[in-house]
């Protein structure tokens, strides 16, 4: 494994740092509204790097403004990149000033890219036998690696020496330029050879040698085991000019004239007065305190490394990241439990503990089929143990009999007085349930604690450990490998498995201590966690394990019908295009739409090609029929591949049912999401969606009961805004869309036309989601002026709605977040952004999130209450939650009774100023129940 040499010359790619930091910490600002994210991120990475390496010589190199020789050689060089965001541009000069104030040499050479400055300095030092460490995330720097030059990527702290380059790219450093020249580099808009991608480039270089050797031996290309090798030689010959150009563009210059030598790049003393001024202005409180308390060197910092790719901070998190303590993980306290004596000793420890962390290890992530291969435990004092239940590799040690071990540990897991902590413990609960253990005493789920604190962050254990503990956990892939050859956990050597599994439990325990402390600062959030998120995980676990029955034969027939419709759409597309083509080929679509039909290019891909994404096709469909056909074709293809073809394959062989996975900690608003299958994405209003729902059926003797909140977000809007017009309409049981139409168009309820009602409905729901006049005009097919007129009329009739929207925007700007009726918070880091697009997007979210989030909270409360009522009743099962709807499987003769129970408890889940209305339907399948 590569190691950093003692006291190398450190060369930092400042431009690479700059963009990484900006995107890792979006829209952090100080009290004056000045953006600080890029400055904070770059300085933090620099301080961490210097603390780690302890160099005496260093330089941070940034790109200069203006063009370079590459721009003059190739006009399209980097031309696809969007202009630098204003929020980033404003931070560059103060960042440069702070870097210099820290005593770090900073270089910006006019007309020369940072890469070329770094390349020149690196080669200069290497030629003198000095060791060099280049800190960058750019792959083109790999061409500089030699016996003295090494790269470090601060995103994952990985090191690349010569051997590392070969392992990562499959070629040595001296062929990196050839590699980039052949396949091109989308980051810099280097064209490469058309049709040559990563695999082809590697095949050529590994099979023949350098690009010069390839062109000298083109006749050998056809013999290579590369796809399309027979015609590749001709393609290379035709693209020779592009290849040569790309080679020059990709080559980092190492002979730039500089007015500085490597000996002059000394890390100097920091300018304390300047740092105090800057850190105070930009509110870098941790660093300010350090300087004020006498830290006069950049290496005298207690700041912990922040991996920029792992955590996107919001404004409230900056101080949390800055003050992250470094938790010591002592793996010497981890044990493996292989004997009965070991297990007995640990059972005594667990019985004596009031709080334990528990984690399962399995051979799959499918909770309905995974085998339990081990359990880990941790105590508050840092002790942890791994109980292996299954080992499958040559010469593996003997484990305790699985049934014996589980029987011994079962009383602890089922004891409600021994409180449990887990990370995504719903999964563990389901695994234990399938092994006859009812997990009780669950008090904390660290994933849900984090989600309750701030729903917009990442909540997996690895990220939480970095963020709150300053600890880098053992990566599963480092033990098991990747891809098809990845080992399952029972195949990992026991010593490594113990370290990994015990660490999971230990880190979970320490995360609970950190997160619970933070949550207790917000009593409303503690209540939200205890009464909603924690009990809901058990409800979801039971729902998931119950699953839903599907009619595979009906889906098979629907797949055939969709296949026929797809064929018909393809024929229509061929006729409109004037030729047959592959509707799934982006390249062919680009040629047909933009070259042949000459439709306007609305967006471009990162590589500069015309985009054919759904948004573009929807827009183009206003001016041509073909894009409309393509949108329909894509929609049907997705339904076929995602549902009608796939659902029958997802039927569990033991239960005969499909078991989705519900996710509590994914959406920012508090809504649940699901996967395998994704129930939320089944279309509601079209015929294909109805047919898919018809395949969700009840078992014999049972019926499907579907209960759906009626217009819940509009009712929440009435409650939150206090608008008397909306309140009256809902309280009197009026058709809200007809009532809105009557108000807007100044007619009686009886005189409202279907078109007027349709327009009013679009306005009602559109405003909830912050729709503009332009968006409304598109949806209704009317002029923008007419759409604006409708919106103006709406706000005249419902003035409190407009006032609510204004107030919520201002409140969000003042506090940085909005709340649901039950206190759930949604942080809005872009709400004060100087970037108008980002700010307006955040304002739309600020309007919608309180309604969408409150609706999510209400249905969660209903689920928890209904679960209490029906949990032990064999005549009813809650089987699905989709949007504002709960679906049950009920014994047919009990439908009338449970129908009323469901309606009653769902409508009582919250007290609003207008009634909550639940519509309940019954049928033999999900569609019939609507």
Curated annotation (Swiss-Prot):
<dbReference type="InterPro" id="IPR019760">
    <property type="entry name" value="DNA-dir_DNA_pol_A_CS"/>
</dbReference>
<keyword id="KW-0235">DNA replication</keyword>
<keyword id="KW-0239">DNA-directed DNA polymerase</keyword>
<feature type="domain" description="5'-3' exonuclease">
    <location>
        <begin position="1"/>
        <end position="327"/>
    </location>
</feature>
<dbReference type="GO" id="GO:0008409">
    <property type="term" value="F:5'-3' exonuclease activity"/>
</dbReference>
<keyword id="KW-0269">Exonuclease</keyword>
<dbReference type="Pfam" id="PF02739">
    <property type="entry name" value="5_3_exonuc_N"/>
</dbReference>
<dbReference type="Pfam" id="PF01612">
    <property type="entry name" value="DNA_pol_A_exo1"/>
</dbReference>
<dbReference type="InterPro" id="IPR002421">
    <property type="entry name" value="5-3_exonuclease"/>
</dbReference>
<keyword id="KW-0548">Nucleotidyltransferase</keyword>
<dbReference type="InterPro" id="IPR036397">
    <property type="entry name" value="RNaseH_sf"/>
</dbReference>
<dbReference type="Pfam" id="PF00476">
    <property type="entry name" value="DNA_pol_A"/>
</dbReference>
<dbReference type="InterPro" id="IPR020045">
    <property type="entry name" value="DNA_polI_H3TH"/>
</dbReference>
<comment type="subunit">
    <text>Single-chain monomer with multiple functions.</text>
</comment>
<dbReference type="GO" id="GO:0006261">
    <property type="term" value="P:DNA-templated DNA replication"/>
</dbReference>
<keyword id="KW-0378">Hydrolase</keyword>
<feature type="region of interest" description="Polymerase">
    <location>
        <begin position="524"/>
        <end position="930"/>
    </location>
</feature>
<dbReference type="InterPro" id="IPR043502">
    <property type="entry name" value="DNA/RNA_pol_sf"/>
</dbReference>
<dbReference type="InterPro" id="IPR001098">
    <property type="entry name" value="DNA-dir_DNA_pol_A_palm_dom"/>
</dbReference>
<dbReference type="InterPro" id="IPR002298">
    <property type="entry name" value="DNA_polymerase_A"/>
</dbReference>
<keyword id="KW-0808">Transferase</keyword>
<dbReference type="GO" id="GO:0008408">
    <property type="term" value="F:3'-5' exonuclease activity"/>
</dbReference>
<keyword id="KW-0238">DNA-binding</keyword>
<dbReference type="GO" id="GO:0003887">
    <property type="term" value="F:DNA-directed DNA polymerase activity"/>
</dbReference>
<dbReference type="InterPro" id="IPR020046">
    <property type="entry name" value="5-3_exonucl_a-hlix_arch_N"/>
</dbReference>
<dbReference type="GO" id="GO:0006302">
    <property type="term" value="P:double-strand break repair"/>
</dbReference>
<dbReference type="InterPro" id="IPR018320">
    <property type="entry name" value="DNA_polymerase_1"/>
</dbReference>
<dbReference type="InterPro" id="IPR002562">
    <property type="entry name" value="3'-5'_exonuclease_dom"/>
</dbReference>
<keyword id="KW-0227">DNA damage</keyword>
<dbReference type="GO" id="GO:0003677">
    <property type="term" value="F:DNA binding"/>
</dbReference>
<feature type="domain" description="3'-5' exonuclease">
    <location>
        <begin position="328"/>
        <end position="520"/>
    </location>
</feature>
<comment type="function">
    <text>In addition to polymerase activity, this DNA polymerase exhibits 3'-5' and 5'-3' exonuclease activity.</text>
</comment>
<dbReference type="InterPro" id="IPR008918">
    <property type="entry name" value="HhH2"/>
</dbReference>
<comment type="similarity">
    <text>Belongs to the DNA polymerase type-A family.</text>
</comment>
<keyword id="KW-0234">DNA repair</keyword>
<keyword id="KW-0540">Nuclease</keyword>
<dbReference type="Pfam" id="PF01367">
    <property type="entry name" value="5_3_exonuc"/>
</dbReference>
<dbReference type="InterPro" id="IPR036279">
    <property type="entry name" value="5-3_exonuclease_C_sf"/>
</dbReference>
<protein>
    <recommendedName>
        <fullName>DNA polymerase I</fullName>
        <ecNumber>2.7.7.7</ecNumber>
    </recommendedName>
</protein>
<dbReference type="InterPro" id="IPR029060">
    <property type="entry name" value="PIN-like_dom_sf"/>
</dbReference>
<dbReference type="InterPro" id="IPR012337">
    <property type="entry name" value="RNaseH-like_sf"/>
</dbReference>
């Amino acid at each position: 494994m590569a190691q950093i040499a003692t006291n190398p010359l450190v060369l930092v790619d400042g431009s690479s740092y700059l963009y990484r930091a900006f995107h890792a910490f979006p829209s952090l600002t100080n009290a004056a509204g000045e953006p600080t994210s890029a400055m904070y991120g770059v300085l933090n990475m620099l301080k961490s790097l210097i603390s780690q390496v302890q160099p005496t010589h260093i330089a941070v190199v940034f790109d200069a403004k203006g063009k370079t020789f590459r721009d003059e050689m190739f006009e399209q060089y980097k031309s696809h990149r969007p202009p630098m965001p204003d929020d980033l541009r404003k931070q560059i000069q103060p960042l440069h000033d702070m870097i210099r104030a820290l005593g770090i040499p900073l270089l910006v050479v006019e007309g020369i890219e940072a890469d070329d400055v770094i390349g020149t300095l690196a080669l200069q030092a290497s030629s003198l036998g000095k060791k060099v460490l280049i800190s960058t995330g750019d792959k083109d720097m790999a061409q500089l690696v030699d016996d003295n030059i090494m790269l470090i990527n601060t995103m994952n702290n990985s090191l690349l020496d010569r051997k590392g380059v070969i392992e990562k790219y499959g070629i040595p450093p001296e062929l990196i330029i050839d590699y980039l020249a052949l396949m091109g580099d989308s980051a810099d808009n280097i064209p490469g050879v058309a049709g040559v991608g990563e695999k082809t480039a590697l095949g050529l270089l590994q099979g023949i040698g350098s690009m010069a050797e390839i062109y000298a031996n083109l006749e050998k290309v056809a013999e290579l085991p590369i796809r399309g090798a027979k015609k590749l030689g001709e393609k290379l010959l035709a693209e020779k000019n592009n290849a040569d150009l790309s080679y020059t563009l990709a080559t980092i210059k190492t002979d730039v004239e500089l007015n500085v030598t490597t000996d002059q790049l000394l890390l100097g003393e920091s300018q304390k007065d300047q740092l105090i001024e800057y850190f105070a202005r930009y509110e870098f409180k941790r660093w300010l305190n350090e300087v004020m308390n006498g830290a006069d060197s950049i290496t005298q910092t207690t700041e912990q490394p922040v991996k920029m790719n792992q955590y996107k901070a919001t404004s409230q998190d900056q101080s949390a990241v800055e003050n992250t303590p470094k938790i010591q993980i002592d793996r010497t306290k981890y044990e493996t439990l292989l004997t009965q004596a070991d297990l007995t000793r640990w059972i005594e420890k667990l019985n004596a503990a009031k709080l334990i962390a528990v984690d399962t290890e399995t051979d799959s992530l499918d909770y309905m089929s995974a085998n339990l291969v081990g359990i880990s435990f941790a105590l508050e004092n840092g002790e942890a143990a791994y109980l292996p239940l299954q080992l499958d590799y040559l010469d593996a040690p003997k484990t305790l009999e699985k049934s014996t071990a589980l029987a011994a540990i079962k009383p602890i897991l089922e004891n409600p007085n021994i409180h449990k902590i887990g990370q995504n413990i719903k999964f563990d609960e389901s695994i234990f349930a399938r092994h006859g253990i009812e997990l009780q005493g669950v008090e904390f789920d660290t994933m849900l604690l984090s989600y309750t604190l701030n729903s917009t962050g990442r909540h997996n254990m690895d990220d939480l450990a970095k963020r709150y503990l300053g600890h880098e956990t053992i990566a599963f892939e480092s033990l098991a490998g990747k891809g098809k050859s990845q080992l399952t956990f029972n195949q990992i050597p026991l010593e490594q498995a113990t370290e990994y599994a015990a660490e999971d439990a230990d880190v979970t325990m320490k995360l609970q201590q950190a997160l619970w402390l933070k949550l207790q600062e917000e009593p409303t959030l503690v209540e939200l966690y205890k009464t909603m998120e924690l009990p809901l995980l058990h409800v979801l676990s039971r729902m998931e394990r119950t699953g839903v029955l599907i009619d595979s034969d009906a889906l098979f027939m629907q797949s055939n019908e969709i296949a026929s419709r797809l064929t018909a759409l393809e024929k229509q597309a061929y006729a409109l295009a004037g030729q047959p083509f592959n509707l799934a080929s982006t390249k062919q679509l680009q040629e047909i739409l933009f070259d042949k039909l000459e439709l306007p290019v609305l967006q471009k891909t990162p590589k500069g090609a015309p985009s054919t994404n759904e948004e573009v096709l929807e827009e183009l469909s206003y001016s041509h029929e073909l894009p409309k056909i393509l949108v329909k074709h894509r929609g049907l293809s997705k339904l076929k591949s995602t549902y009608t073809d796939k659902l029958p394959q997802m039927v569990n062989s033991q239960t005969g049912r499909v078991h989705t996975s519900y996710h509590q900690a994914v959406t920012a608003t508090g809504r649940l999401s699901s996967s395998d299958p994704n129930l939320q994405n089944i279309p509601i209003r079209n015929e294909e969606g109805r047919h898919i729902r018809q395949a969700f059926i009840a078992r014999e003797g049972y019926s499907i009961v579907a209960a759906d909140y009626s217009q819940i977000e509009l009712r929440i809007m009435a409650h939150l805004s206090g608008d008397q017009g909306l309140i009256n309409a809902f309280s009197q049981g009026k058709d809200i869309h007809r009532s809105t139409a009557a108000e807007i168009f100044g007619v009686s309820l009886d005189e409202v036309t279907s078109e007027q009602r349709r327009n009013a409905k679009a306005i009602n729901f559109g405003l909830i989601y912050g729709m503009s006049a332009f968006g409304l005009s598109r949806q209704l097919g009317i002029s923008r002026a007419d759409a604006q007129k409708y919106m103006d009329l709406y706000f005249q009739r419902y003035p409190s709605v407009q006032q609510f929207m204004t107030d919520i925007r201002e409140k969000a700007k003042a506090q940085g977040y909005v709340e649901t009726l039950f206190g759930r918070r949604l942080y809005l880091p872009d709400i004060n952004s100087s970037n108008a697009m980002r700010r307006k997007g955040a304002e739309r979210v600020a309007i919608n999130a309180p309604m969408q989030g409150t609706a999510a909270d209400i249905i969660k409360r209903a689920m928890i209450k209904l679960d209490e009522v029906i949990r032990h009743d064999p005549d009813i099962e809650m089987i699905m939650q989709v949007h504002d709807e709960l679906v049950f499987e009920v014994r047919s003769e009990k439908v009338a009774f449970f129908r009323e129970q469901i309606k009653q408890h769902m409508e009582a889940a919250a007290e609003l100023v207008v009634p909550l209305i639940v519509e309940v339907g019954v049928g033999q399948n999900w569609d019939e129940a609507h």
